Amino acid sequence: MRTSQYLFSTLKETPNDAQVVSHQLMLRAGMIRPLASGMYNWLPTGLRVLKKVENIIREEMNKSGALEVEMPVVQPADLWVESERWEDYGPELLRFKDRGDRPFVLGPTHEEVITDLVRREVSSYKQLPLNLYQIQTKFRDEVRPRFGVMRGREFLMKDAYSFHTSKESLQETYDVMHQTYSNIFTRLGLDFRPVAADTGSIGGSASHEFQVLAQSGEDDVVFSTESDYAANIELAEAIAVGERQAPTAEMTLVDTPNAKTIAELVEQFNLPIEKTVKTLIVKGASEEQPLVALVIRGDHELNEIKAVKCEEVAEPFEFADEAEIKAKIGAGIGSLGPVNMPIPVIIDRSVALMSDFGAGANIDGKHYFNINWERDVALPKIADLRNVVEGDPSPDGKGTLLIKRGIEVGHIFQLGTKYSEAMKATVQGEDGRPQTMIMGCYGIGVTRVVAAAIEQHHDERGIIWPTDAIAPFTVAVVPMNMHKSESVQTFAEDLYKTLRSQGVDVIFDDRKERPGVMFADMELIGVPHMLVIGEKNLENGEIEYKNRRTGEKQMIAKDQLLDFLKGRINQ
């Protein structure tokens, strides 16, 4: 490709509204341009990268035995009513009607459509297992799209769905998909972790996320210092270590009119924060017990995913409001505690080990200090309620936990029969009777992969693609002052034609630009290998080679150039 025949839309300045590095660099490199909130046009440079990522995903999916299909983006609403997600999915589901007043949705995912397709096409257990995938546009009407293509409203996704007659068969395919995803992200050159995760609104029994480690990530990824244990912080088990110490002081009621938060209590009364607890009132799961008190240590954070796993807590999770709390308990939010609490109490494991701790007295402006379990208040139900923190023991007993930020680029689920049961997707079983199909679901955010690669691999000059395989071009031929030197122009033209004939993805910068501008543009878009052709070097029989990834520079003899490149490309 010649730059003179290419839409080379690089920017010198970073747009003000671009917050994360990937968004900034994708705009500056001329990869994308905004169309509307959370929606982007992909320019030639960006699309080249996107297609290369897509092709790697397709190759590995095909190797796994999955079969590619394509389903419409527009879906009839009656499928969503049938699956019982029409009401549950919320405003992210874009709903509209056609000219015949028939309701449709713009697909955020394709569980309903694929289940409908398979129930029509598959009738016998002999046709299973079956794994179908597509690479297709999705639309989710995010309330706050941000970070460029990292969290857009319209995006490209690879979604696969498998169908089975047994849990064992599902597990086999799930394991194959787990390995396939690892192969994909390894080929893409990403530093990633597969982590145990919550199944969320999609449902199911088991789930793993594939997280690319990057400071700009929205998820907290937890992993062990000494084992393969890894989990999303939502699912990571918090282990409490040690034994509860014996009381050393009597419980006392203290006036605390100006201490309505843990921070104020710690500062005003010189209490260690680990000797305080916070009591959070949430909606209960039954009419008899409409409110529940959850108690965690003052320096810990409540994990809402874990909380709703307690049978007493309502799902979806919801905090009680101030009026409800005041009416039931008689005190405001800043003065709550487990002593004399008139509603069910659940405490975190770490709280169960505390002694001589401080908490609200359920009287406005007052706290109890030196509270002890089984002396001042009965020990209530104990559960894992908190987020883990760095240094906690790993749940597998090996090492301690580290926490890093991650970008979720893939997610696999064991769905079970949630959709097939609701939509009556059955096959004839071995015994001749109808059997509900068991499903798996496997997604990769293709557009997000591009952004994640940039977040993980860049410098002050621009993008550094982690592998040649996804760079927009593999080699850049950059002739200096070509339009003033016949020898430079002739050699550059011949080299460009030779590289193209050998199947090298090459960009030839034939613009009438200063060398500095040409170098800056090639570095910005991340071309891994740059060949700089100068008149003086040509006279010496040499070409300058620059490696974008390593920063290496060296002079290469003209007659050795092709062999040299063969040894460097894709390394």
From Swiss-Prot:
Sorted alphabetically, the Gene Ontology cellular component annotations on this record are:
cytosol
Q: Which CDD domains match?
A: ProRS-INS, ProRS_anticodon_short, ProRS_core_prok
Catalytic activity, EC? 6.1.1.15
Task: Indicate yes or no for the key word Acetylation.
Answer: no
**Matching InterPro entries:** aa-tRNA-synt_IIb, aa-tRNA-synth_II, aa-tRNA-synth_II/BPL/LPL, Anticodon-bd, Anticodon-bd_dom_sf, Pro-tRNA-ligase_IIa, Pro-tRNA-synth_IIa_bac-type, Pro-tRNA-Synthase_IIa_type1
Keyword Protein biosynthesis assigned to the entry: answer is yes
Q: Which SUPFAM superfamilies match?
A: Class II aaRS ABD-related, Class II aaRS and biotin synthetases, YbaK/ProRS associated domain
Q: What are the BP-aspect GO terms?
A: prolyl-tRNA aminoacylation
Q: Name one GO molecular function term.
A: ATP binding
From what superkingdom does this record's organism come? Bacteria
Kindly state which reaction or reactions the protein catalyses. Answer: tRNA(Pro) + L-proline + ATP = L-prolyl-tRNA(Pro) + AMP + diphosphate
**Primary residence:** cytoplasm
The entry describes its oligomerization and partners as: Homodimer.
Per the entry, what this protein does is:
Catalyzes the attachment of proline to tRNA(Pro) in a two-step reaction: proline is first activated by ATP to form Pro-AMP and then transferred to the acceptor end of tRNA(Pro). As ProRS can inadvertently accommodate and process non-cognate amino acids such as alanine and cysteine, to avoid such errors it has two additional distinct editing activities against alanine. One activity is designated as 'pretransfer' editing and involves the tRNA(Pro)-independent hydrolysis of activated Ala-AMP.
Q: Which family does the entry's similarity section mention?
A: Belongs to the class-II aminoacyl-tRNA synthetase family. ProS type 1 subfamily.
* Record's comment describing the protein's domains: Consists of three domains: the N-terminal catalytic domain, the editing domain and the C-terminal anticodon-binding domain.
- What name does UniProt use for this protein? Proline--tRNA ligase
Source organism of this protein record: Glaesserella parasuis serovar 5 (strain SH0165) (Haemophilus parasuis)
